[in-house]
């Protein structure tokens, strides 16, 4: 068996964008690969047919999504043509759509729109619903000529040196500055080449679900001018009259999803009253006027996939209504599965394997998922009666003949709460030797570690480290009470992590307890900062995309003004002392641990100022420390950053631990 190398992950393939055909016999999806030399990702469409064959549909490396127009035709956006690519690079609002005929493989340009379209839905009769970005500075780009649009783009270049902000949030991680920019709903008539806006310039459309036979659509929206609230609304659109009506059954509510289930509307959301913004949602039913509602199911777990991995790229579906059921992905324990629920309120689990369901689609009896299973990378599966049939082998050779470390579970208790963690032994483990170890802490905090493939941890195991990780209180998968650490950051979660570390060291005597390091990102970075200010037991630390100071986080993060208040039950004005008590920066004068900080310049979730503050504090107090900043990257560097940057990140972390733990 060969040792796993750092660069191996650049050869992995990542799957996303499942879309089943109208008859359910085939499914189209996107395969992403890394082009390390040119520091980019390549994305192309593939088709899985009922006869078991997999066919590549595009090869221009520009296609990430598609919809079915009929059984023989797909519609997809692309910048494959030079004129389109040039205008996109010149910052023109533009999306060009192409039609692909599956029988002949002919591709033709269908239409182009002076909008940056994020989603398209075909209504029939050459009419489409669009979700597209609207920038108030650009104005109504769909109403002016190409010449006038070019002039507008040139005029705005004069504004490149300035950002005028008059609302919060004013930026968003992965998007940049978002002031007075919204996702609006449009109707496009391709026969008339006519675009009609259906929502105003202050409203964000977060999701849309169609019911073509009823001639209606459901929209989840949020409107704001100065400050975005934590509630949103449910609207219904009449596709004939284009009348948009608010039908929110519950006010001051956070709607996650709404769709048509038979002659009822099923919606998923949370009141936030008992457990704040991270409260697990419930499932409800209402009629199409939204005058009353009933709770269909009192879910005890969340409705998203929160299983961590660094081997995904692209987006996945979380909800879909098909025939008599609402299908959704949910995390229970340390893995996610696909579930469904009908009007009778009975909850059924559709998948049975442990791991991670990263995307799915359903059409009648056909169920398709993209999943991580055991220590295998993503593949496409069909599901029937909970049995999974692997349909693709894109990654079958990626880990072939590679040495992998199987995570060994460790269940223990703290404060009468059951907790789970895992330990990975070094490759080529010899019980006569002693090894260094790394504690890895996940982000969130409401996410989970599981037993799926995680490249960085497998790589460290192959470099001769024990690697151990757990789901402390605050994590997902075990209900609201377990996940609720509001006002308790750095207390019970810290205790869980330290007791876990004790138990790992006691259970694995081959770990050299004087050569143990700690790392983590986001919340895991916060906990790394907290840990080094409260104990000197770790010989080295790497803090990634972290939080150091809740007060600065409150005023700079794209989620700061509501997340900091919710998670600390305090603001800088009503209880600044509490924010400071839970800020790692307060304890920086107690740090002795050599610490590396990893931070992206465009991380607007945990802004660069967080890493800089902690780094400066350690330098001020004479602690060995180093800060590596990544230009052009955001909070998702470790998951979707440019290939060369992801390699450099892992190299910096590994070399730091090699230096201080060997």
PLM features per residue range, with description:
Residues 32, 133, 440-444, 600:
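Glycine-rich His-Gly loop
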Residues 1-14, 47-64, 88-93, 98-118, ...:
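Multi-bladed beta-propeller domains
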């Amino acid at each position: 068996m060969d040792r796993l190398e750092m660069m191996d992950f650049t050869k992995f393939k990542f799957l996303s964008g499942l879309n089943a055909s109208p008859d359910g016999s085939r499914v189209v999806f996107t395969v992403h690969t890394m082009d390390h030399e040119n520091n980019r990702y390549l994305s192309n469409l593939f088709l899985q047919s009922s006869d078991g064959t997999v066919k590549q549909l595009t090869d221009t490396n520009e296609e990430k999504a598609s919809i079915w127009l009929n059984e023989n035709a797909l519609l997809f956006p692309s910048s494959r043509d030079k004129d389109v690519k040039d205008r996109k690079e010149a910052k023109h609002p533009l999306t060009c759509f192409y039609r692909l005929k599956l029988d002949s493989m002919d591709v033709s340009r269908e239409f182009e729109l002076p909008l940056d379209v994020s989603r398209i839905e075909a209504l029939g009769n050459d009419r489409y619903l669009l979700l597209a970005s609207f920038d108030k500075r650009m104005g109504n780009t769909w109403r002016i000529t190409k010449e006038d649009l070019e002039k507008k783009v040139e005029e705005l270049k004069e504004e490149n040196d300035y950002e005028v902000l008059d609302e919060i949030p004013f930026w968003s991680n992965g998007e940049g500055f978002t002031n007075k920019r919204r996702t609006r709903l449009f109707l496009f008539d391709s026969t008339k080449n006519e675009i009609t806006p259906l929502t105003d310039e202050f409203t964000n459309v977060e999701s849309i679900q169609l019911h073509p036979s009823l001639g209606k659509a459901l929209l989840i929206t949020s409107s704001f001018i100065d400050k975005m609230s934590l509630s949103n609304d449910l609207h219904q659109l009449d596709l004939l009259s284009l009348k948009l009506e608010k039908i929110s059954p519950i006010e001051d509510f956070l709607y996650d999803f709404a769709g048509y289930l038979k002659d009822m509307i099923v919606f998923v959301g949370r009141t936030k009253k008992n457990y704040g913004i991270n409260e697990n949602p419930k499932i409800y039913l209402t009629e199409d006027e939204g005058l009353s509602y009933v709770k269909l199911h009192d879910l005890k777990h969340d409705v998203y996939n929160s299983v961590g991995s660094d081997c995904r790229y692209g987006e996945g579906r979380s909800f879909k209504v098909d025939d008599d059921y609402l299908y959704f992905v949910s995390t229970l324990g340390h893995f996610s599965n696909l579930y469904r629920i009908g009007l009778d309120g009975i909850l059924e689990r559709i998948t049975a394997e442990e791991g991670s369901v990263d995307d799915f689609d359903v059409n009648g009896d056909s169920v398709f998922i993209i999943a991580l299973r055991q220590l295998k990378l993503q593949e496409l599966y069909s599901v029937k009666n909970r049995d999974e049939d692997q349909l693709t082998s894109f990654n079958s050779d990626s880990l072939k003949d590679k040495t992998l470390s199987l995570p060994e579970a460790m269940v223990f208790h703290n404060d009468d709460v059951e907790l789970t963690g895992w330990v990975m032994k070094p490759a080529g483990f010899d019980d006569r030797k002693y090894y260094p170890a790394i504690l890895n802490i996940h982000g969130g905090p409401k996410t989970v570690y599981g037993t799926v493939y995680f490249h960085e941890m497998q790589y460290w195991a192959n470099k001769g480290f024990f690697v151990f990780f757990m789901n402390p209180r605050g994590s997902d998968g075990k209900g609201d009470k377990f996940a609720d650490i509001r006002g308790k950051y750095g207390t019970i979660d810290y205790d869980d992590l330290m007791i876990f570390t004790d138990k790992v060291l006691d259970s694995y005597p081959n770990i050299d307890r004087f050569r143990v390091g700690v790392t983590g990102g986001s919340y895991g970075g916060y906990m790394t900062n907290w840990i080094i200010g409260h104990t000197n037991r770790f010989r080295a630390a790497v803090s990634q995309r972290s939080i150091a100071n809740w007060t600065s986080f409150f005023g700079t993060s794209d989620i700061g003004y509501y997340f900091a208040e919710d998670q600390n039950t305090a603001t800088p004005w009503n209880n600044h002392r509490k924010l400071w008590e839970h800020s790692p920066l307060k304890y920086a004068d107690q740090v002795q641990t050599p610490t590396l900080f990893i931070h992206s310049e465009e991380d607007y979730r945990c802004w660069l100022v967080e890493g800089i503050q902690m780094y400066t504090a350690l330098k001020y107090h004479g602690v060995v420390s180093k800060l590596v900043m990544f230009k052009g990257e955001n909070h998702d560097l470790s998951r979707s950053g440019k290939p060369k940057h992801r390699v450099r990140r892992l190299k910096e972390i590994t070399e730091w631990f090699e230096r201080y733990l060997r």
